[in-house]
Amino acid sequence: LRIPCCPVNLKRLLVVVVVVVLVVVVIVGALLMGL
């Protein structure tokens, strides 16, 4: 697996992934609480 870009973009991508995962967890948790 080659990453031709600099680690700054990788760090930004990691932050975006973490935020998306947190949002999904919150939504799923809210749905489970609603049920």
From Swiss-Prot:
Any GO CC annotation of this UniProt entry: extracellular region
Keyword tags: Gaseous exchange, Lipoprotein, Palmitate, Secreted, Surface film
One Pfam family per UniProt: SP_C-Propep
Coiled coil: none
Protein's cellular compartments: Secreted, Extracellular space, Surface film
Keyword Secreted: yes
Lipid anchor positions (S-palmitoyl cysteine): C5, C6
Single Gene Ontology BP annotation: respiratory gaseous exchange by respiratory system
Domain of life from the UniProt record: Eukaryota
InterPro entries linked: SP-C_palmitoylation_site, Surfactant_protein_propep
Other facts noted in the record for this chain: Pulmonary surfactant consists of 90% lipid and 10% protein. There are 4 surfactant-associated proteins: 2 collagenous, carbohydrate-binding glycoproteins (SP-A and SP-D) and 2 small hydrophobic proteins (SP-B and SP-C).
Protein task: Pulmonary surfactant associated proteins promote alveolar stability by lowering the surface tension at the air-liquid interface in the peripheral air spaces.
Name of the protein: Surfactant protein C
